[in-house]
Amino acid sequence: MTIRALSVSLIAIPLVVAAADPSGKAVLKNAEGKEVGTATFTPTKGGVKVQVQVANLPPGKHGIHIHAVAKCEPPEFKSAGGHFNPAAKKHGFHNPEGAHAGDLPNLTVGENGKAKATATMKGATLGEGDGSLFGPDGTALVVHADPDDEKTDPAGNSGARIACGVIEKK
């Protein structure tokens, strides 16, 4: 191998490593500290794919959001802060000035207490930058008691926080 070829190879290595953003996972727990679900986070073109799976939650629609602090102190989970909103937008998919990067579609839980959902967070990343879920304060996924109306700022009238999980690198 020539010195020139070796130099090109060494320059390309950081580019390949930088292109591979990490993935993430959150274990969701209720106010009693019992595990009620998981969420996975994978990089995708233009954002982050979120897959949520829950059990033992009340039936019905529940607002789910990414919150701006990686803390889930029960019973109210207020330690998770407000919604993840690096672009300083208003709340909700139906708000002309929205949505927060942390806004996700409602989660519909069946009569059996279970639900699965997949969504893409546009403008978020698992790499570095303002939209990173792994920024200085980290982030958490929060499940709310009520449905999100997808327009009322700051949280869509989605009620109390009933489950929370810190998003960690996988």
Residue ranges and their predicted role:
Residues 1-2:
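N-terminal secretory signal peptides that target proteins for export/translocation
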Residues 5-14:
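Bacterial N-terminal signal peptides
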Residues 18-170:
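N-terminal leader/targeting pre-sequences
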